[in-house]
């Protein structure tokens, strides 16, 4: 995994943290022939890591800053098998052929999941920090007939203080994996 500090960052554009990227990549179970859609690509952390392990990545974000940040990171890490698009994922999904999806943003999530089911996407991994979004995503996947697995991951980082060391935790992330039956 590439360390978070190596990525170009822009104020207000989120990045999936290194340890969460590692678990999410593991859940995607990527193959060199996979074509992956990254919805809500943010700073492009997942796009870069996925592209290193798959045939091609389509990255989408509705923020121009996110699109630009992802593009900068793709160039920085010499990733050529990824294309970034600006817009609403629900309107763009039908333009692409892919077999796996990573979702880092939850805008219009229920409509997006319905479209993914219509396209018979074999595996979807969705990350969320908001509990209600996690429940909504899990319920929708179950309604659509997917096998669903989910895990909540908490990461703490060590920090030296004058009297020793402490662990500082980040927000826990729910990682939802849905596999087509």
From Swiss-Prot:
- UniProt source species: Methanococcus maripaludis (strain C6 / ATCC BAA-1332)
Q: What is its EC number?
A: 2.1.1.196
Alphabetically, which GO biological process terms does the record hold? anaerobic cobalamin biosynthetic process; methylation
Q: Which GO-annotated molecular functions does the record name?
A: cobalt-precorrin-6B C5-methyltransferase activity; protein methyltransferase activity
| Annotated keywords | Cobalamin biosynthesis, Methyltransferase, S-adenosyl-L-methionine, Transferase
Q: What catalytic activity does the UniProt entry give for this protein?
A: Co-precorrin-6B + S-adenosyl-L-methionine = Co-precorrin-7 + S-adenosyl-L-homocysteine + CO2
Keyword Transferase attached: yes
Please name the pathway. Answer: Cofactor biosynthesis; adenosylcobalamin biosynthesis; cob(II)yrinate a,c-diamide from sirohydrochlorin (anaerobic route): step 8/10
- The UniProt record gives the binding positions of S-adenosyl-L-methionine as 16, 40-44, 61, 89
Q: What class of enzyme is it?
A: transferase
Q: What is the protein name stated in its UniProt record?
A: Probable cobalt-precorrin-6B C(15)-methyltransferase (decarboxylating)
Q: Which family does it belong to?
A: Belongs to the methyltransferase superfamily. Archaeal-type CbiT family.
